[in-house]
Structures are given as structure tokens and as C-alpha cells.
């Protein structure tokens, strides 16, 4: 069975908001633009049933596929919330790198292709990312029950009381986010890194409060260590409060240890899932920084000198060499290295969703094509990739790191 990722202006206009994210009747397909036609290569689907779930995931994440879009959905950790395995992030892009018109087009195409998860933060573009996201959601008039919005709280302003994870800032910061988003609630509010100045009990109580007040459905952590997450869970259980359901963590071919050795243990013990970001290592895996830093690329932006240095460093050059070695595998699967890298992230135990960062429709469609690659990542192929990378973590590492 082959799933066509078709998207044209006509199909976008013809489908009502009630149809989106719901199975639709097949069309003639004459006006559709398939993934293959947008230059992106996808693997032959005849080899395996597209709905077949990898054995690695079948006993871990309950996964389903909507035939009309090909999108896969998973539970967020062991909660009941169903999220698309690919989500759309807004870091760097919304309110900054791209225009509001481009942002709207990206959200529309993503939503039409089954993406139901949109991630942002109060700090992104000094709040403009939330404003842009909220403005688009209001304009599109999609059913609020059909999508998931997540935001992150920590850096809200310059005043001492406008940042961190104090009860004051968690509550006031989330209220500010809701105002910018023009929403009554967010589905998940994340603590955007740990705050050493705020007691854990205060953080958990504040998160429980905003959930009980209807300002959020769930709460999670971002850039927290496994020990910190376990402490939050223990505090929640001790005082009959609400524990976190998810950790946002960086995860890609060259950043593996936390997601592969620490978070799976938390998933099995306390049900905390993983929502991962930067699957392409801020573009390093795409090959755009092989020789120089292109204009208008992320590494050329003000404040991203660290990325430029990383791209041209000796370590960056070694990583480029590893990526080149992955090309034959991608060729065998009839996909791009970008699609292979994203599918590789999706195959990891306990990963509920991978957040995408894109600045144009072509990138988005290519990234979405990773879903078709996922069923073809056999244990043998994963082992072959591990041998090329040479960085498979020791599964017995101390989870306190």
C-alpha cells in the first residue's frame, strides 16, 4: 500500500475544518503532488505493509496510522493523549526567520497531512512566536479538540520575577502565553529547564495548580536530567499532586545517550514519554554546512555563532563524514538522508513525537516523508547505521548524568 503525501492549493481549499485530521474519501489524485514529485524520495511500499509497526515499538507505544494522510499517532508517554509522531516546532522560525504568511502555509500543510502537535515557548522570538501561532490558529478556525498546543515556561522577561520556575512565574508566565496564543488552555506546559532557585515541591504544586485551573491539560519537563524528573514524580506522589508526563530532549544521530539510555527507564518506571527536538542537529545532518555557512541559514543568524563554530569545527567535519557514509543506505531505501535521520529518531524506544523545524514547504514535505521510511528500518539496518556512527551508548550508563 502506498500513501501519497498530496498537497495543492486546491486540496487545501476544498477540505473543510471538519475534515482535517479525519479520514477522507479518496480523490482522483490528478491534481495531487506526491512526495516523490517534490524531489523527495520515498521507499518502495510494496516490501512491507505501511501499517505494520516495527517490532521494537509494538510492545512499547500503541501506534495507529490514518490512511488518508499516512500520519502515525502515539500516546504521549503513558498518558492517554494521542499525538502525531511528527510535530511542528516554532523555534527560530515563527515570528523571526519566516513571515507570518509562510508560517500559516506551513501550519496548513502540516495540519492537512495529519500533524496535530504544535510546539512553542514564551521565549521564542520574545513572545512573537506564540502570537504568530495564536493568530494563525484563530484564523484557521480548526476545532480546538483536533490539535495539541504546547508551550514552555522559564524565560519570560528581564525582571527577576519574570523568569525561572517560581510559583509566581509559572502561573503569570502561562497566563501571558495564553493571552498571546489567544487560547483558553494549552495541552501541555513544559518547564523549560530546571530552576535551581525554586524548590521542587513549589514547581510541582504550581504545575498542578495551572492544570486544576484549566490553564493546561498536562505538564512536562524540558532539558531536565533523569534524576530531576524522578524527583518531581516522587514529590507528586508524596503530596498527591500531578506528575510530569513528558520530557523534551535533544535527539539526533550525534546526540543519543539521554534518549536511548535514561529516558526509556523513566518511561517504563513512571510513564514519562519523550518528545524530541533537533532531529537534524540544527541542519548539520542535511549537509548544508559542508563547506561554508550559507546566507539565511540558521548558523548565519545573530546569536547563533555557536552553531557556526560547531559546523566548521573538527568535530563538525567528522560528523559530515559520517553523514556521507549514510548516503548508500538512504539510496537503498530510496529516500533522502534527512528522511532517514528523522525516521531513525522515530524508531527509538519511548519517543512519542519528533518536533520538526522547517522554514519552507519543500523542507516540510521532505521531513513528513520520513514516516514512509520508518517501517523499513529493520534491526539489521539500524545495526549498520550504528556501525557507521560508532557512538551507540552503553545501555548501563548511570541515569543521573
Curated annotation (Swiss-Prot):
Localisation: Cytoplasm
Keywords on record: Cytoplasm, Ion channel, Ion transport, NADP, Oxidoreductase, Potassium, Potassium transport, Transport, Voltage-gated channel
The keyword Chloroplast is annotated on this UniProt entry: no
Active-site residues, as the UniProt record annotates them: 124 (proton donor/acceptor)
Pfam family, one: Aldo_ket_red
Polar residues bias spans: 1-14, 32-41
EC number annotated for this UniProt entry: 1.1.1.-
GO molecular function per UniProt: aldo-keto reductase (NADPH) activity; potassium channel regulator activity; transmembrane transporter binding; voltage-gated potassium channel activity
Residues engaged in binding NADP(+): 90-91, 97, 119, 192, 222-223, 248, 277-282, 288, 298, 357, 359, 363, 366-367
Subunit: Forms heteromultimeric complex with alpha subunits. Identified in potassium channel complexes containing KCNA1 and KCNA2.
Function: Regulatory subunit of the voltage-gated potassium (Kv) channels composed of pore-forming and potassium-conducting alpha subunits and of regulatory beta subunit. The beta-3/KCNAB3 subunit may mediate closure of potassium channels. Increases and accelerates inactivation of Kv1.1/KCNA1 and Kv2.2/KCNA2 subunit-containing channels. May display nicotinamide adenine dinucleotide phosphate (NADPH)-dependent aldoketoreductase activity. The binding of oxidized and reduced NADP(H) cofactors may be required for the regulation of potassium channel activity.
Protein name as catalogued: Voltage-gated potassium channel subunit beta-3
Naturally occurring in which organism (per UniProt): Xenopus laevis
